Each structure stands twice: as structure tokens, then as C-alpha cells.
């Protein structure tokens, strides 16, 4: 790590000097030209943080995710019997692979909402759950009804072929949809992922 004055030191030495195994950093970005309190107002729902210019036509791919949850009243175990995603992404070149990409994204979003978490040992800064024995991911028994709806779209503004990237479109809103479904079922607004049993205990 190099300081502005040119001095440098190895990260391992800094960790040792601090007596800490983990360093966390939190940062906020305020677009150029926006007032300094824009982010705080945005958090409070008092303003919309909009900056930058773009052509008049919006050419992004879009999706909306819907989730049904069942929560055991005794154990607070959360199950997801149904995932539905509706997507529009321009001209689809290969329906089969596009559907598979979106379906796996829905499952991944559910996984990040309820299971996945990288755990660190604070003393050594080493990953505790570094293999699939300890890092939780969904298995077939965790995935029930997954429905992908692909809406037709002709977009000649995006590019001459009218195609758009799917990428991670399937998982973008899924964990938020899971959290909203949990809130609807329990009245508890959970703002940290993954949502664990202890978050739902009274």
C-alpha cells in the first residue's frame, strides 16, 4: 500500500501492526455536480439522485421478479416454492440458452438471499467456509417451481441486430423480492443478506 507522500508498506505488515485480521471499508459515491447531502436525502426518500446524460431512448434489458415464500411458524425456516421472472431483452438469438441463463439467475438470487455468505476469521483474515461443504448453495430440493417469462421486444435503437445482454439480469431483483416476500409474511423488514432464521425470531 502506498501513501500520497510516497511511503509504502506491505498489507500484511499493516494488518499485523493494527492487530486486526479484517479491514472493512464503506464508501458512497456522489455524482459530479450533485449537492453534498444528496445521498442522505436519497436514503430518506427526499430526493432523486439523477445525473448524467444519455440518448432519449432507453435501451437496457429489463426484468421483474416475483417470489412466494413459506415460513415455518415454529422453526422460522424459509422455503421458496415459487419463483417467477418476466424479462425483456431485445431480440433473443437462442431461446433455450437465454431461458436457462435467466432461470439460473433466479435460483442464484434466491441463493444469495437465503444461503450464501462468505465468512472470515477475524484473527487470521482467512475464509472459513472455503469449499462447497461449508459454503451454502441451493440443491435441487431447494428449488421448486421456477417460471421464466420472456416478453418479445423489438429495439432498433440498441443496435442494428436489436440484441441485448442477459448476463446477470435474472438475479438482479430476486433477493429483494425474497426479502419483500419475507416482510409480507412476517412483518419483519430484513435489510441484510442472507436472511437467517435468527432474523425472524421474536
Language model features with spans:
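C-terminal catalytic domains of large/alpha subunits in multi-subunit enzymes
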Residues: 1-202
Amino acid at each position: 500500500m502506498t501513501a500520497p507522500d510516497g511511503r509504502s508498506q506491505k498489507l500484511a505488515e499493516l494488518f499485523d501492526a493494527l492487530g486486526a485480521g479484517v479491514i472493512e471499508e464503506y464508501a458512497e459515491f456522489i455524482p459530479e455536480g450533485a449537492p453534498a447531502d444528496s445521498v442522505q436525502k436519497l436514503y430518506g426518500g427526499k430526493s432523486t439522485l439523477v445525473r448524467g446524460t444519455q440518448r432519449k431512448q432507453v435501451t437496457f434489458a429489463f426484468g421483474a421478479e416475483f417470489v412466494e415464500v413459506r415460513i415455518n411458524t415454529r422453526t422460522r425456516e424459509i422455503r421458496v416454492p415459487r419463483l417467477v421472472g418476466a424479462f425483456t431483452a431485445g431480440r433473443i438469438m437462442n431461446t433455450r440458452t437465454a431461458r436457462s441463463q435467466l432461470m439460473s439467475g433466479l435460483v442464484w438470487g434466491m441463493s444469495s438471499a437465503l444461503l450464501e455468505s462468505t465468512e472470515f476469521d477475524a484473527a487470521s483474515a482467512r475464509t472459513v467456509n472455503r469449499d462447497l461443504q461449508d459454503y451454502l448453495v441451493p440443491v435441487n430440493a431447494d428449488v421448486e417451481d421456477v417460471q421464466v417469462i420472456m416478453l418479445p421486444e423489438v429495439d432498433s435503437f440498441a443496435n442494428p441486430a436489436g440484441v441485448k445482454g442477459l448476463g446477470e439480469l435474472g438475479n438482479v431483483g430476486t433477493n429483494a423480492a425474497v426479502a419483500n416476500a419475507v416482510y409480507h409474511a412476517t412483518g419483519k423488514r430484513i435489510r441484510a443478506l442472507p436472511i437467517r432464521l435468527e432474523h425472524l425470531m421474536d
